């Protein structure tokens, strides 16, 4: 089964909590703090694996969570860092942020790695909070939470040449004749339902990758059939081989087919429409009158194309000429990275974890309510039953400007300040 799009949820590991611990040994009455730091959470890393050709694995697994860091321990023991989670993807995978649909990274190189989300930092143990005036801190820092992200993986095949044309014009036959690929071939429409890749390796030319794209029909750019899914797979090709059934045995007019396909390309992407094309009139062995080819060639040249190649993939007549021309043109066409504008790029916030502080006044009870991620993190680090810890708590509120903001809001002596389930009276 060929899967070229998948949605998954990823989360890096949480940092381990710092430890609150004190040295307790015989004959050491004032051992002091010795709580160790927590370990960092595991990252999630994307890695290109050339042995994978589809996103099938992501059909069955939708959630990826890295390992949390271990908590710190006594005797200044540091927690073990969480193990990184490596997710292997096919070459040519584009990663998008689901909500905005913006591109995070284009994984188009062999062995390429990208750290998608970083693990939370481990919290500091109480050893790190000891000072000359605060020698026995009864608090430690909790680990930072892991980062969460919902992403879309989108596979776009990496091929030098894309075979383009209506269904049943001979694209798969040409691929099978010139590579070791074994696409399904039959005399009916949409025999090919997934892209096929093959390496063209013929004496005298430099090898290149050719892709057989499932047949495109009128309205493909608007999604008729599986049009958009098929069209996106030729976005990365440097050269298009546009194959037309010149025999007309199915009742279609060859030149009309040629024009319709190019119109679909233009609707989907002007850049794709402007890509170099080799025009091939296939099934020439079934042609009853050479004037049909000559008329087709004349009309195509009027559109600005230099040459039309007459070919019969079934008898291999003219195949080598087409392949050699493709190899020659590829030497002149530079390899380009996928162009992504700034507007299309997903730029994460500089601070992956931001402190949110929200202060509201409840006039009925003269209570000031402080909430947000900052409060959750601060309270998890403070021992409210320890005087030294409460002094640290007050210092943090002051340094963060919260006490000044409370005064600006009109707080008075005796008013209540609430942080989650913890309350205290404000004293001037």
Swiss-Prot record:
What CDD domains is this protein classified in?
A: Obg
Which biological process terms from the Gene Ontology are attached to this UniProt entry?
Answer: ribosome biogenesis
Q: Which residues participate in GTP binding?
A: 165-172, 190-194, 212-215, 282-285, 312-314
Keyword match Repeat: no
Binding positions for Mg(2+)? 172, 192
Q: Spell out the InterPro entries in the cross-references.
A: G_OBG (IPR031167), GTP-bd (IPR006073), GTP-bd_Obg/CgtA (IPR014100), GTP-bd_prot_GTP1/OBG_C_sf (IPR036346), GTP1-OBG_CS (IPR006074), GTP1_OBG_dom (IPR006169), GTP1_OBG_dom_sf (IPR036726), OBG_GTPase (IPR045086)
Question: Which EC class heads this enzyme's classification?
Answer: hydrolase
Q: What is its EC number?
A: 3.6.5.-
Q: Which domain of life is it from?
A: Bacteria
Stretches assigned to the OBG-type G domain = 159-331
Q: Which residues form the OCT domain?
A: 345-428
Q: Could you tell me which residue ranges the Obg domain spans?
A: 1-158
| Annotated GO MF terms | GTP binding; GTPase activity; magnesium ion binding
Q: How does it assemble?
A: Monomer.
- The name under which this protein is listed is GTPase Obg
- Source organism per entry reads Clostridium botulinum (strain Eklund 17B / Type B)
């Amino acid at each position: 089964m060929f899967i070229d799009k998948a949605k998954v949820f990823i989360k890096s590991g949480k940092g381990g909590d710092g430890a609150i611990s004190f040295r307790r040994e015989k004959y050491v009455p004032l051992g002091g703090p010795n709580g160790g730091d927590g370990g960092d959470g595991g990252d999630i890393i994307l890695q290109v694996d050339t042995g994978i050709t589809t996103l099938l694995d992501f059909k069955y697994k939708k959630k990826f969570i890295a390992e949390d860091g271990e908590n710190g321990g006594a005797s200044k023991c540091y927690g073990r860092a969480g193990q990184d989670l490596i997710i292997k993807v096919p070459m040519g995978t584009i990663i998008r942020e689901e909500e905005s649909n913006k591109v995070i990274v284009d994984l188009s190189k062999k062995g390429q790695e990208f750290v998608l989300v970083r693990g939370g930092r481990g919290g500091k143990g109480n050893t790190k909070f000891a000072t000359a005036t605060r020698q026995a801190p009864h608090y430690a820092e909790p680990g930072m939470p892991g980062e969460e992200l919902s992403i879309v993986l989108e596979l776009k095949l990496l091929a030098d040449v894309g075979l383009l044309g209506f269904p049943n014009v001979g694209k798969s036959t040409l691929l099978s004749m010139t590579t070791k690929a074994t696409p399904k071939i039959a005399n009916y429409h949409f025999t090919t339902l997934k892209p096929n890749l093959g390496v063209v390796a013929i004496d005298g030319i430099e090898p290149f990758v050719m892709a057989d794209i499932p047949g495109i029909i009128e309205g493909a750019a608007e999604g008729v059939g599986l049009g958009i899914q098929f069209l996106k797979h030729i976005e990365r090709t440097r050269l298009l081989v546009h194959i037309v059934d010149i025999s007309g045995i199915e009742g279609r007019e060859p030149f009309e087919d040629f024009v319709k396909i190019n119109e679909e390309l233009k609707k989907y992407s002007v850049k794709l429409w402007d890509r170099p094309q080799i025009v091939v009139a296939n099934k020439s062995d079934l042609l009853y009158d050479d004037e049909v080819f000559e008329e087709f060639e004349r009309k195509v040249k009027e559109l600005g194309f230099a040459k039309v190649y007459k070919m019969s993939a079934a008898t291999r007549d003219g195949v080598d000429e087409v392949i050699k021309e493709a190899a020659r043109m590829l030497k002149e066409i530079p390899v380009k990275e996928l162009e992504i504008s700034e507007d299309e790029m997903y730029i994460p916030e500089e601070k992956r974890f931001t402190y949110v502080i929200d202060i509201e006044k409840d006039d009925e009870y003269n209570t000031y309510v402080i909430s947000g991620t900052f409060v959750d993190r601060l309270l998890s680090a403070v021992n409210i039953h320890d005087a030294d810890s409460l002094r640290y708590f007050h210092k943090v509120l002051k340094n963060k400007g919260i006490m000044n903001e409370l005064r600006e809001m009109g707080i008075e002596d005796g008013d209540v300040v609430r942080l989650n389930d913890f309350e205290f009276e404000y004293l001037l």
